[in-house]
Amino acid sequence: MGAPPRNAPVTTGFLVLSSKARDTFRHVTEPAGHALARAGITANGLTAIGLAGSLGAGALIATGQPVVGGAVSLLSGLPDMLDGAVAKASGRASRRGAFLDSVVDRLSDAAVLSGIVFFAVVRDLGTMATLAALVLGLSLIVSYIKARAESLGFACNVGIAERPERVIVLGLALLLGHAVAGLWVLLAGTVITVVQRILVVWQQSDVGPDLGR
């Protein structure tokens, strides 16, 4: 059976919605990026601050301070959301910077979620530990799908639970003392995002599934 057309409704709808969300986000970050660049703040500096904050948040959570850790995690997300805008505003956007940013994002995710796993295991909170481990694994899969798809030439900027959404949901859940509820939301969101990205890439590909196998 042949593949769906490249402009299939599912693919087009996902990409249009994601494009609108990115445009809205860009209207907020671009002015801030220009202001920070004029102040001499560098994109790599912001990336480093974000990573340090995430590592600190993970350590705070692991040592029994999830509320403070949630607040720090939210704050650490701010420089991470602005480093790309600063790089563009300063004319220093590069593939090396994009690569570094992607690696740091994965390390930041791992730091906070690993902190939750440690916190939960020490206190015998099985549900929380399991959810955090699943969200961590699925978050890495979400990122891998995009990286692999783009390396093959496919557009894959879709998903209801990309990194900014994950940082906000998890940070607020920890801050408000509802970590398990937040993790359930993230689990559902990351599963949906995995499916969205697979569908988008599948419908852009030339080879469809062989239903006779």
Language-model-detected regions and their locations in the chain:
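Helix-loop junctions at the membrane-solvent interface of multi-pass transporters
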Residues: 40, 60-64, 115, 175-176
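Short polybasic/polar patches that bind polyanions
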Residues: 37, 61, 88, 150, ...
